[in-house]
Amino acid sequence: MGVPLFELTMNDRTISQQGTGKISILSPADLEIAEVTADPGVARTGASTDFSRMTPLPKGTRATVIGREGEWIRLDYGAWIQASEVQIVKDAVPARSIIRSARSRQVSGWTEVLFPLETPVPVTVQEGERTFTLTLYNTTAQTDIIRLDDDPVISRLAWQQISPLQVQYTFNLKSAQQWGYKLRYDGTTLVLSLKHPPANTSMMPVSPAKPLSGIKILIDAGHGGPQDSGAVSPVGIREKTVTLIVSKLVQEELVNRGANVVMTRVEDVDLDLPPRVEMIQKEEPAIAISIHYNALPDNGDAINTKGVGAFWFHPQAHSLAMFLHNYLVAKLNRPSYGVFWNNLAMTRPAVAPSVLMELGFTINPEEFEWIVNPTEQKKLAQAIAQGVTEWFASVK
């Protein structure tokens, strides 16, 4: 059809502007099929990293390309993805599927729900209050049977065809606290994995001396190494130094309570965000906590800005973020900076409730004195460990 021409008319005056792109009408036979090659593919609401993230697409997902903008591709279910994260599949059939069944099975620490499909279709998930909802796009149900045995996580499953090409599965859960999930394709079978609660959150008795016995906790000391010092105080002390000191103290306190603690770093070394995230994915801890200290831009109000902040992304991490924030503010008599939903690398892992704690502002002169005080650092570590302990007790 060619290049579009836009015209605006007002008060008998017309302004014309030629578009920067072309408009084409493609035959359905000419539509391209994109297959996700990244693990996972980052789906967004628009054609830029400025747009919000949607549920990541498992490697192998296929969808029809319905638009392009620069280095971005629009998929038929509504999301955009960078062209570098997909490959165009030649002579592929339209990415549509029939689903006839589903079944569950238990593996070590997880319940897997298998959805046999004809092609790997796009998916989204949503965590609710005692519910986990999975939506399959470009899918039509011809379902006769679903096997779902008694399970540590799932109490019941309901499903419905919510539109001609969308099937939605709602898992009713036995606990309000969710512990993590994973999505992958085995061939054309979608595998949804839901993590079981830590053994220590069951009704089994726990040793008062070791209340976190059997629980794996990942502690991330923010920043590190010569390339990433983090925030710098007025006297030159770097955030990376304090986060490591406090993280090691937290590790000691958690171990004393029986926890199995995994540290992303124990020395002043460079460690980019992707390896930290990969460690969470590999270790599959019960929870992950990233330790940081805050700062402001050069024009920020350093004198009047201070306090403890907590950040979460997935709903499963909200309870932990809120509990730790409130506990530290009350226990240590610290000001509150607030609790925030935030799309951060260290809050995005879905395999475990993952939070990032900003424990104070290094640029605030008064708070800085508290931050670097060894006695206060010890009290802070004890409060974090005790807060974690009491949170686990609260979600039984």
Predicted features along the sequence, with ranges:
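Short linear recognition/processing motifs and adjacent strand/loop elements at protein termini
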Residues: 1-217, 256, 293
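Solvent-exposed loop/turn segments at secondary-structure junctions
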Residues: 223-226, 237, 267-271, 293-298, ...
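Active-site histidine-acidic residue metal-binding/catalytic motifs
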Residues: 196-279, 283-285, 297-300, 304-306
